[in-house]
Amino acid sequence: DIFDRGPGAQHIMDTVMHYHNVDVQWGNHDMLWMGAAAGNLACMANVIRIALRYANLDTIEDGYNINLLPLARFAMDTYADDPCDCFKPKMGDSDASYDEKSVYLISQMHKAIAVIQFKLEHALIAAHPEYKMADRDLFDKINWEEGTLDLTHTAPNGGYGHHPMLDMNFPTVNHDNPFELTPEEAYVVEQLRLS
């Protein structure tokens, strides 16, 4: 897991590229990065979400020059009045340089890209039932009136029951078509893809 070891994964890859012969066992994060580099939009969103979850933006912004400004603007507009508490980054001592405003912005961006990721993953799951990943599609299992997630049909033995949602503020999720990207989300995805 070269890309699961904190900031600077690009430096490791640059060093490895100069070796004559290398034996690498790729990890799940490496596979996500390869999928993103190959143009898979769900992998791209997942890579960015993980970086935001751990406030590890160096590899994204500095290492690969991926422009996160469209995502930041979208997140600030969409979640302006949302504390995004469930999406605060998990930060270690090395991330102490982030001030409160930066942590809030990262939280907003994390929430925005998480919603986008789940929508993009749905298209893959729906197109490939042989993957047997339908239990990963969750937006259509939310009871918006009660604020619960219905997992009764997601396990082999009948399910895991109903669970209260910790966050119900998803303004870009259309309750009638929860996996559809809004035009603004589609724009963010395209800008990230082009970056």
Task: Please state what every model-predicted region is.
Residues I2-S195:
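Feature recognizes metal-dependent phosphohydrolase scaffolds
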